[in-house]
Amino acid sequence: MPSFTQPHSAPRNFQFPGQQRQGDPTMGTINAELADKGFLVTSTDELITWARTGSLMWMTFGLACCAIEMMQMSMPRYDIERFGVAPRASPRQSDLMIVAGTLCNKMAPALRKVYDQMPEPRYVISMGSCANGGGYYHYSYSVVRGCDRVVPVDIYVPGCPPTAEALLYGILLLQRKIRRNGSIER
């Protein structure tokens, strides 16, 4: 029987649900007795959190040139779906929004409306200098100086425009943050 406690192909920082409690002597005994029978003992919250990190559904909110790099991330060279992140077109089916580009004052209510349509728990990645703080157009009268003034942002990806690798790293950081917090609600 394969052992579920020691995965052979998992990355170094990967943890199956329940591994956070391996130091507990009671859980260690139960896990040891059931591991050779093909069972995994965990809590519901740990299982949901583990599943959530591997099934992020993202939607684009591309406003400028950063959106090109965001599209490149889902192409075969980087293949973001191998990390458990798949694109969705509807905000009602996605739990991650990537804001890429310059957010102007007229577009801010639309961003908030789309964010409010997303189901909980929902996450936001701010991609690029313009989305992070206004960027090149920071002093313009019509530009919002960062999308965090409209929606709460979880991860900031710097650059003008940031590379697809930087966005991919930001998504991996978000997965690590979800795994570390381990909460269903924000």
Curated annotation (Swiss-Prot):
Statement: the UniProt record of this protein carries the keyword Cell wall biogenesis/degradation: no
Subcellular location: Cell inner membrane
Cross-referenced InterPro entries: NADH_UbQ_OxRdtase-like_20kDa (IPR006137), NADH_UQ_OxRdtase_20Kd_su (IPR006138)
Domain of life: Bacteria
E.C. designation(s): 7.1.1.-
Entries under Gene3D superfamilies matching the protein: 3.40.50.12280
Cofactor: [4Fe-4S] cluster
Keywords: 4Fe-4S, Cell inner membrane, Cell membrane, Iron, Iron-sulfur, Membrane, Metal-binding, NAD, Quinone, Translocase, Transport, Ubiquinone
Any Pfam family hit: Oxidored_q6
The reaction(s) this protein catalyses: a quinone + NADH + 5 H(+)(in) = a quinol + NAD(+) + 4 H(+)(out)
Region (Disordered): 1-27
GO BP terms: aerobic respiration; electron transport coupled proton transport
GO cellular component, one term: plasma membrane
Major localization listed first in the record, in broad terms: membrane
Membrane topology listed for this record: Peripheral membrane protein
Record note on cofactor: Binds 1 [4Fe-4S] cluster.
Molecular functions (GO terms): 4 iron, 4 sulfur cluster binding; iron ion binding; NADH dehydrogenase (ubiquinone) activity; NADH:ubiquinone reductase (non-electrogenic) activity; quinone binding
Oligomer and partners: NDH-1 is composed of 14 different subunits. Subunits NuoB, C, D, E, F, and G constitute the peripheral sector of the complex.
Family in the record: Belongs to the complex I 20 kDa subunit family.
Function per UniProt: NDH-1 shuttles electrons from NADH, via FMN and iron-sulfur (Fe-S) centers, to quinones in the respiratory chain. The immediate electron acceptor for the enzyme in this species is believed to be ubiquinone. Couples the redox reaction to proton translocation (for every two electrons transferred, four hydrogen ions are translocated across the cytoplasmic membrane), and thus conserves the redox energy in a proton gradient.
Protein name (database record): NADH-quinone oxidoreductase subunit B 2
